[in-house]
Design a protein with these regions (language model features):
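Short, aromatic-rich amphipathic segments at membrane interfaces
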Residues: 175, 198-228
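Sec/Tat signal peptide C-region and signal peptidase I cleavage site
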Residues: 19-23
Length: 248
């Protein structure tokens, strides 16, 4: 038995006895509740696993797992070409765009939930509430933001990312890239049957800076002048050292 399946079986055996699963509809857990961003952080994989109530089991049941990060303001600029030179053109600012958003499901979202339900639940990239600050909303800026975040692996959809084991157990793997920002994250699990959400659960996840990375961030924000001087000094020293080595 693979490790994810073993975890799922252990979860089912332990929680089915200790918790009234019938009342909740779904039980779930994360492989870790905290992700530490260190100096050499290259990303982290998060395992989401759980089980649905017996009365919800069956081929008509689907599971959707999403992970959302803290909101952050983002400016999207359009490049324009003038006299053969590319320059910054019109821009649009999104005040509260998710810094990270990933969603996985047992089947493509459009076959699980109607477009109206996806908009209401804000599930899927097309249904994210991305509202620009400007008076006139240009859909090209919204799509450009989604494309940019997707290329950075900060946005993503996996239409078959949730795996079912038997009729009740499920698990999904979500990847947090190195560019994620610290803060509170939330995992949402939806159990869908016949186009309706019949059970749900949310789990908190925290991304924190740790070690040297945390100290550098603290100095940069608490003592920006000292940080700037140190950065200039280190850059100058690196340049001098490089010239000496190449001279030899």
């Amino acid at each position: 038995v693979s490790a994810p399946v073993a975890w799922l079986l252990a979860l089912l055996a332990t929680l089915a006895v200790a918790t009234p699963l019938r009342a909740q509809g779904v039980l779930a857990e994360l492989s870790q509740r905290e992700v530490a961003v260190t100096t050499g952080f290259a990303g982290a994989e998060l395992l989401v696993f759980g089980t649905t109530a017996a009365e919800l089991a069956g081929p008509e049941t689907d599971v959707i797992v999403s992970l959302r990060g803290p909101n952050a303001a983002v400016v999207v600029r359009r490049k324009v070409r003038i006299a053969g030179i590319w320059l910054n053109g019109p821009s649009e600012q999104f005040e509260a765009a998710p810094s990270f958003y990933a969603v996985s499901s047992t089947r493509p979202l459009e076959t699980v939930l109607s477009a109206e339900e996806r908009r209401r639940l804000r599930i899927g990239l097309a249904s994210l509430p991305l509202s620009p600050r400007g008076q006139i909303e240009d859909p090209t800026f919204r799509q450009a933001l989604i494309d940019l975040k997707t290329s950075q692996r900060l946005f993503g959809e996996d239409p078959e990312g949730v795996r079912l084991v038997g009729d009740r157990l499920f698990h999904a793997r979500l990847f947090l890239p190195s560019a994620v920002i610290p803060g509170p994250y939330r995992v949402d699990i939806l159990v869908v049957r016949d186009g309706r959400v019949v059970a749900s659960r949310d789990l908190p996840l925290t991304v924190v800076r740790a070690g040297t990375s945390a100290e550098i961030w603290r100095v940069a924000h608490d003592q920006p002048l000292a940080y700037g001087i140190a950065a200039v000094f280190l850059a100058a020293f690196a340049g001098w050292l490089g010239s000496v080595l190449f001279r030899r």
